[in-house]
């Protein structure tokens, strides 16, 4: 009971309250907000409820916020309702997603590139978003000047390329 901090494999620093450790299963659980810092990948996780397999390095969680390269001026920010992460290979599957890419990803710091979708998966730098929307327009109180909706959006971070299946471009205020 109470506040606790755990360092696992010298890579993952867990900070939470009332952590439960299932020794035989090598599982760490927390039902209260938890912060995890992945030192190797410079990634910050904030999770409301989690289960972590120490042996497999698999993290399951609810109400998740992720900040990649959190110590740099520009970073990607992820918001998921539920997700499962393989921390070894940096892959995931998630539900109810909102991804804000770093502002200068496409060479313009004034943009706010972002995805929203029903679900998402990612492996080897390729992210697939189901029933998604993308825009890079600056955020404001109104809807963006344009967006692309698609049944499937494939974002290749390595190539900085976005592919759409069955897409619809929406342009506003013409």
Per-region residue spans from a language model:
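Structural signature for solvent-exposed beta-strand/loop edge elements and short helix-capping sites
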Residues: 1-174
